[in-house]
A protein has these predicted regions:
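A short beta-strand-loop-beta hairpin characteristic of the jelly-roll/cupin
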Residues: 91-111
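Short beta-strand His + acidic residue motifs that chelate non-heme Fe in jelly-roll/DSBH
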Residues: 73-75, 98-100, 117-118, 122-129
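Charged, amphipathic alpha-helical linkers/stalks
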Residues: 137-204
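Extracellular structured ligand-interaction cores
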Residues: 58-61, 85-89, 97, 122, ...
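Non-heme Fe(II)/2-oxoglutarate
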Residues: 1-53, 160-166, 213-267
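Conserved short histidine dyad/triad with adjacent acidic residue
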Residues: 63-81
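A short hydrophobic beta-strand segment most commonly corresponding to one strand
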Residues: 86-91, 116, 130-148
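Charged, low-complexity interaction regions
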Residues: 181, 199-208, 225-234
């Protein structure tokens, strides 16, 4: 039903989506909260079956529609949601004039195929046709079984999931997508990854690079100190917020004072 289709949060013209797995199973695009199947998914047995066939714990998942002649502008997915999750695209309605661009590669995702891509690379989508394109889009982190399949994908036979009205699919959904406070080890890993990416860009100023390295590692060290004393206790949140605010005040005002080498994102 058309009543399930929502405009995308980005406000891009011609982009709409039906939430299938969402926070509390409601009609939203949120990330932070227990994920549940929506009414739309419960009424779509075959789609329910397709998502369940992966056997994975899934995060936010949607039907995503791109109107005739519309496009998704080039961008990078750098929300915290994407630190540990990837996106699966399964084209439901498409045609050869719909193309996906990721980095320096382009591909037409054919109907019924299953595609996985690196959303940290710059990517965009163009629907140059006169008909709408609809994909089933599933976000997940993936178990070791899932990643073994990904590693062997080029040598595996295709698996066809046919509609089965007698099946009782169960979609496992994330219940704890975000910790109340980021663990210091996770923060350090993210900081080191960003710093390494920026240090790989020869155009970045070396003095500014050193300044940001010290600033961000100071953030991690002080975060770890508060974590060791208070953990998740309610009284700790003001202390964590103080560290974040202090760090933010020391950032340079320019939005691109440092730029990543991998995808040209400004820090």
């Amino acid at each position: 039903s058309e009543r399930y289709w929502l405009d995308r949060p980005s406000g891009l013209p011609g982009n709409s989506a039906v939430p299938l797995v969402s926070v509390d199973g409601a009609m939203n695009h949120a990330f932070d909260g227990a994920m549940k199947p929506t009414e739309a998914l419960m009424k779509s047995h075959y789609i329910h079956q397709a998502i369940a066939s992966f056997g994975e714990v899934v995060a936010r998942s949607r039907l995503m529609r791109l109107a005739p002649g519309a496009q998704v502008a080039e961008h990078v997915d750098f929300n915290y949601h994407w630190v540990s999750r990837v996106r699966i695209h399964i084209p439901i309605i498409t045609n050869p004039q719909v193309n996906f661009y990721c980095g320096d590669e382009s591909v037409h995702m054919a109907q019924g195929e299953s595609w996985l891509f690196d959303s940290w690379r710059r990517h965009r989508v163009v629907n140059a046709s006169d008909s709408a394109r609809t994909h089933l889009v599933i976000d997940l982190a993936g178990s070791s079984r899932f990643w073994r399949i990904v590693r062997k994908a080029d040598s595996l036979d295709n698996i066809v999931i046919l509609p089965n009205d007698h099946s009782q699919p169960r979609v496992k959904t994330e219940q704890f997508p975000v910790a109340p406070v980021m663990a210091p080890g996770e923060m350090l890993a993210i900081v080191e990854q960003v710093l390494e990416d920026c240090e790989s860009n020869p155009d970045n100023d070396s003095e500014m690079m050193l300044r940001y390295r010290h600033l961000l590692l100071d953030l991690v060290h002080d975060w770890r100190e508060v974590w060791g004393l208070y953990g998740f206790n309610d009284g700790a949140f003001d202390r964590y917020r103080h560290i974040l605010d202090r760090t933010a005040r020391q950032l340079a005002p320019q939005p691109r004072v440092l730029v990543t080498a991998s995808n040209n994102v400004g820090i």
